[in-house]
Amino acid sequence: MKRIVIIDYGLGNLRSVQKGLEHAGASPAISGNPEEILAADGIILPGVGAFIDAMKCLVPLKKTIAEFAESGKPMLGICLGQQVLMSSSEEGRLTDGLDLIQGRVLRFPKSELKVPQMGWNNIRVKQDHPLFKGIPDGSFVYFVHSYYVDTAAENTLASCEYGLEYAASVVNSKGNVMGTQFHPEKSGATGLKILRNFVEMC
């Protein structure tokens, strides 16, 4: 069985992601050990909270995560885990991210829409990629976030409309580093299919 490691860096609802992967047919481990991370067939970077706190917690693992990404093996960031894959964030103060995918994390502009975006919204699939195999355009997934990813079209796997169009899912140029702003582990059958697709990529 493929070895998938959920990275434990002090932030994130690890158990819900673990349960989601188990429902997708995997037996994931939770670890913050660099050797275990590098030995994995695939890794998941979860995250709930503030960008600046996440980057502080990730300092001991930055080199490990960069090395894993360079290896070409699949990596998936979820929610805040997608945001930290980017170059920078304006949350709190301008803070550098892991810079595995070029782009910025920005606050939703003031509008009549409530921030954070919390609940179900539909996504538009923008690229033919294994992560979205069998996912119909317009599928609904579950979001909870106040900041969004602004990145180039070639890095956008799926988009979402919430006052503006933003990257609901991202990918690097190699195709192995991916992120979802939504929570696949909370997105019903659609999210389960996305997690299964990730497991199949590993």
UniProtKB/Swiss-Prot annotation:
IGPS catalyzes the conversion of PRFAR and glutamine to IGP, AICAR and glutamate. The HisH subunit catalyzes the hydrolysis of glutamine to glutamate and ammonia as part of the synthesis of IGP and AICAR. The resulting ammonia molecule is channeled to the active site of HisF. The keyword Cytoplasm applies. InterPro entries: Class_I_gatase-like, GATASE, Imidazole-glycPsynth_HisH. SMART domains: GATase_5. It catalyses: 5-[(5-phospho-1-deoxy-D-ribulos-1-ylimino)methylamino]-1-(5-phospho-beta-D-ribosyl)imidazole-4-carboxamide + L-glutamine = D-erythro-1-(imidazol-4-yl)glycerol 3-phosphate + 5-amino-1-(5-phospho-beta-D-ribosyl)imidazole-4-carboxamide + L-glutamate + H(+); L-glutamine + H2O = L-glutamate + NH4(+). Residues 3-202 form the Glutamine amidotransferase type-1 domain. The active site is at C79, H183, E185. One of its GO terms (molecular function) is lyase activity. It is found in: Cytoplasm. Pathway: Amino-acid biosynthesis; L-histidine biosynthesis; L-histidine from 5-phospho-alpha-D-ribose 1-diphosphate: step 5/9. Heterodimer of HisH and HisF. Disulfide bonds: none annotated. It holds the Pfam family GATase. This is Imidazole glycerol phosphate synthase subunit HisH. It comes from Methanosarcina mazei (strain ATCC BAA-159 / DSM 3647 / Goe1 / Go1 / JCM 11833 / OCM 88). Gene3D superfamilies: 3.40.50.880. One of its GO terms (cellular component) is cytoplasm. Its EC number is 4.3.2.10, 3.5.1.2. GO terms for biological process: L-histidine biosynthetic process. Keywords: Amino-acid biosynthesis, Cytoplasm, Glutamine amidotransferase, Histidine biosynthesis, Hydrolase, Lyase. It comes from the Archaea.
